[in-house]
C-alpha cells in the first residue's frame, strides 16, 4: 500500500481519468443516441462494466507485480525464510492488491455520479461483490506473478486474455442484444458472469442469474486458492 501512495498519480488518478474519458465518450457522446437497455439509460448501464474493467486490471497487475518484484530482486527468499506461513504471505500480497482495487473502484463509482444519477438497488451486495471480485482476481494476479519469469510474461495474460474478455463480457452492451449464436459463445466467457452479477447489484436486472454468477465467482476463487496451495506445497518457481 505504501508503494501505491508513493505513486498516487499512476495508481489512482490515471485509472480514474481513463474511466472518465469512457464516461464522456460512451456515456455522453454515444449514449445519448442509444435507447435504454432494460429500462436503464445507456450512460448508467455501462457504469458497472467500466468499474469492473478497471478493478480487474488493477487487481491482477497489483498482485502480479507485487510478488514478481521480490522474485526478480531475489528478496522473496527472505520472505519465504521468515517465520510466517504461506497463508500469511498470500494474505499480505493479496489484501494489499485488493484494497487498492476496491479504493480505485469506489473512486470511479463516486466519479460516475458527476456524469449520471445513480440509484443503486443493492448497495450492500454491490460492495460485497466489489470486494469479492477484487480478492479473487488479486489471487489470480498472485499466481501470474509467480508463474512469470520476465516482464513480458507478466503482461501477457492481462493484455491478451483478460482485457479482450472484459470488453467482450458485456461491459458496454447486454448479452441479450447479440445474435443467438454469439449469446451462447458469450456464456463461455467467465467475465460475463462477473459483470452480470455486479450490474444486478446496481439495477436488479442481469443477463445471467445472480445465483449462477455468484457460484462462478466463488468457484474461480476456490480454484485460485487451490492453485496457490500447490504452488507453496511444491515450491513452484519460488524455491531454488
Regions flagged by a language model, labelled:
Residues 1-123, 128-240:
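Hydrophobic transmembrane alpha-helices and immediately adjacent juxtamembrane helices
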